[in-house]
Every structure is written in structure tokens, then in C-alpha cells.
């Protein structure tokens, strides 16, 4: 996969995982909003795994677009796909950043989200270990302690890697932590491996000599922007406004990579070489959502179904069709 900067130069345990992906199905009193006339505030997340969201927040493109309509913008940080999907399901945000496969799991579990935009094509996850651990391949993880965040692309990546080695989750000892805590646990020696996520993964590589012992860019599902289905149905014009602002931010990011680096450094407090490593693995040039994303997400879904994570009676292809909504595409489907 060509990197973000390279493309600029060229073109300028089933229930547990499903529960984490869906998150909080029965939150009481959650402020779900369906009436367009009532919308006085659009609520989005920002995340260090979604560089475009940082540019959008910093530059104020959406605030400018909504100002004349008297609609405010509120930002909430998501620490992982699981958190973004939890916030969406609970009605705390209207738009959230997640991995495509994580969004599929959430929808299978009843979280009514639609994936409407591809903010990145990343290689943001891999399996990570210490350089002296003796772990060199997924088969070596049998009986080992692995830090992972349930309901996220790194978790799904781990399941698929274990599956490819003839192993299941039960053959290892999963330690459930948020991504940053997983890095800490690995470096302290509390776990043997970590299903990593950038930029924490890049930081562990550069600052602590951690080793990405298993990589598979094709098994990283796309970074997608999700919206609550009822919000999109009631407010299609606002969805288009958000996508247009995202496009403004994405175009700006490609033209101004130094600004993206500065925004990520400020948000993460990580040094520039770490952020450069993350961005080298991140392609921002394919925002239209469609066939390519569907194929990637469906492949992950079928693997998870084979592993027993998605129920056997679930029609994965139909679930993917229900997830991806191309109506708001900024350009042709890919």
C-alpha cells in the first residue's frame, strides 16, 4: 500500500466480542435525536487513529459551514473503535471513527450504525512483542499473555492471525486493556505480546525497540466514519455537510503533511519520528466508500464467523450491505 506521503507526491468468545462491539444496548435516557428541526448541535469524535479528524477539529471547517445555520459543533475523543461505537450506540455522538470490521460487529450486535466515508486506508495494527521475547510468529502465542482491546481492529486482526496458525482465542491468555495500556503492559513485561494500534505501536517500535512480528496490511480493515442510522435518515443534509467538511480537511491534510504531523504531535505528545512512522502507514487518498471496503470488511466478517465470533446463522454479506451507505460519497465508489 502506498503511504500517505507517497500518494501526495504521486497525486498531490463470541458474546464477549459482540458485546464490546455493540456496547450498551440498553442505555436509559440516551439522547437519540431524529427530528432535524431539533438539531442545534452536531457531535463528532476525534481520534489519534483518524488523522483527518484532528485536522477537521483544528481548522474549524465544520464550524464555519454550520455557523450561519446556528448549529454548534461538539467534539469528543475516542480512544478506540470500541469507544466510538459505544458513544454512537448510546447517543453521545452523531458521527464516530472506527475500523470497518469493528463497525460490522457492532451492527451485527444491533448497534444501528452506517459507514458513510473512508477517512483512511491504514496499516494501523500488527502483532507486537519485545525484541527478547522469543516470539516470532502467531503460532508462538499459544499459552502466552496478549494485551488486546476487544471490539477493535487489533482484536479482529489477532483473531485472524491466531486462526491462520491453527489457534483460537482460548489457546492464548487475553488481557483486556485499552490500546495505550496494552503498550505499557508489553513494555513492562506484564504481557508477552500486544495487538497494537498506531500511533502507540509506532512509539513502542521507535522508543522501546518493540518488534512487529506479524504484519498483514490486507487484514487491516479501512478507517470509516460511522453515523447513527436514525440521524442520517432524519438529517441527510447535515450528513452531507459533515462529509464536505471532512473532504476539506482531507484535502488540506494531503497538501499540508507538516500540519497533520503537528496536530498529531500535539494530540499524542509523541515525537515527530513516531508520527512520521504512523503516517507512512496511512493512505488518505481514497475517501469514497463502496466495493473495496465492503470486500475487506466481508473477508474479516467471514473469518470471524468461522472462528465462532459471529453467529453461524448471520448472513455476513447482508450485514455488510446494511452497514455501508454510499449515498453520501464525495466521489465515485471504489
Tell me what each language-model feature is:
Residues 1-12, 19-27:
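N-terminal secretory signal peptides
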Residues 30-36:
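Sec/Tat signal peptide C-region and signal peptidase I cleavage site
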Residues 37-168, 173-176, 192-196, 212, ...:
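Short, glycine-/small- and polar/acidic-enriched structural segments
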Residues 59, 85, 89, 100-103, ...:
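Extracytoplasmic/secreted envelope proteins and their assembly/folding machinery
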Residues 63-71, 284-293, 316:
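Short, solvent-exposed loop/beta-turn-alpha elements that line the ligand-binding surface or hinge
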Residues 101, 174-175, 180-266:
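Pocket-lining segment of extracytoplasmic ligand-binding domains
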Residues 234-311:
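Secondary-structure end/capping motifs
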Residues 305-334:
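Conserved C-terminal helix/tail region of periplasmic/extracytoplasmic solute-binding proteins
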Amino acid at each position: 500500500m502506498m503511504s500517505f506521503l507517497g500518494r501526495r507526491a504521486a497525486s498531490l468468545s463470541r458474546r464477549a466480542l459482540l458485546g464490546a462491539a455493540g456496547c450498551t444496548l440498553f442505555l436509559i435516557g440516551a439522547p437519540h435525536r431524529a427530528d432535524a428541526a431539533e438539531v442545534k448541535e452536531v457531535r463528532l469524535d476525534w481520534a489519534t487513529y483518524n488523522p483527518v479528524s484532528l485536522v477537521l477539529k483544528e481548522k474549524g471547517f465544520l464550524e464555519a459551514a454550520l455557523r450561519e445555520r446556528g448549529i454548534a459543533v461538539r467534539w469528543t475523543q475516542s480512544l478506540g473503535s470500541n469507544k466510538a461505537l459505544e458513544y454512537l450506540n448510546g447517543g453521545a455522538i452523531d458521527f464516530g471513527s472506527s475500523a470497518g470490521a469493528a463497525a460490522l460487529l457492532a451492527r451485527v450486535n444491533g448497534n444501528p450504525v452506517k459507514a458513510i466515508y473512508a477517512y483512511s486506508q491504514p496499516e494501523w495494527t500488527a502483532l507486537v512483542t519485545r525484541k527478547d521475547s522469543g516470539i516470532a510468529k502467531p503460532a508462538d502465542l499459544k499459552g502466552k499473555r496478549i494485551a488486546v482491546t476487544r471490539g477493535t481492529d487489533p482484536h479482529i486482526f489477532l483473531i485472524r492471525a491466531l486462526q491462520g496458525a491453527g489457534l483460537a482465542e482460548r489457546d492464548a491468555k487475553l488481557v483486556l486493556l485499552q490500546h495505550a495500556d496494552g503498550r505499557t503492559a508489553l513494555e513492562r513485561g506484564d504481557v508477552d505480546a500486544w495487538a497494537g494500534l498506531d500511533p502507540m505501536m509506532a512509539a513502542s517500535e521507535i522508543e522501546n525497540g518493540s518488534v512487529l512480528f506479524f504484519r498483514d496490511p490486507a487484514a487491516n480493515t479501512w478507517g470509516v466514519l460511522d453515523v447513527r442510522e436514525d440521524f442520517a435518515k432524519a438529517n441527510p443534509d447535515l450528513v452531507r455537510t459533515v462529509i464536505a467538511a471532512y473532504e476539506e480537511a482531507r484535502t488540506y491534510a494531503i497538501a499540508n503533511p507538516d500540519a497533520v504531523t503537528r496536530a498529531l504531535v500535539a494530540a499524542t505528545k509523541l515525537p515527530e519520528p513516531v508520527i512520521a512512522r504512523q503516517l507512512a502507514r496511512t493512505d488518505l487518498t481514497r475517501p469514497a466508500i463502496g466495493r473495496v471496503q465492503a470486500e475487506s470488511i466481508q473477508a474479516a466478517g467471514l473469518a470471524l464467523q468461522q472462528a465462532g465470533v459471529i453467529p453461524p446463522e448471520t448472513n455476513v454479506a447482508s450485514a455488510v450491505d446494511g452497514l455501508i451507505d454510499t449515498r453520501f460519497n464525495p466521489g465515485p465508489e471504489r
